[in-house]
Amino acid sequence: MRILIIEDEQHLAEALGQIMAEQKYQVDLVYDGAEGLDYGLSCQYDAILLDVMLPKLNGFEVARRLREARVSSPILMLTARDEIGDKISG
């Protein structure tokens, strides 16, 4: 399985990547929304872990653009935000 992690906190991204690599997943790590969008559009991923608060493009915008481009990979949103509006948007 190939997983894309889009997370701007490098230590968290690397920890998630290490855990998944130990489980034999192939992992790509990127640290901003624009680069994450490029990766998501250029490769077929089995899942995308996507932070909401990202530099350049936020996670909601990345998810919207991926869906507009008909990328069908499951997207799992990561966030510490707990507002109802954020949950609805995600």
PLM regions and their residue ranges:
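N-terminal/domain-start alpha-helical segments
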Residues: 1-90
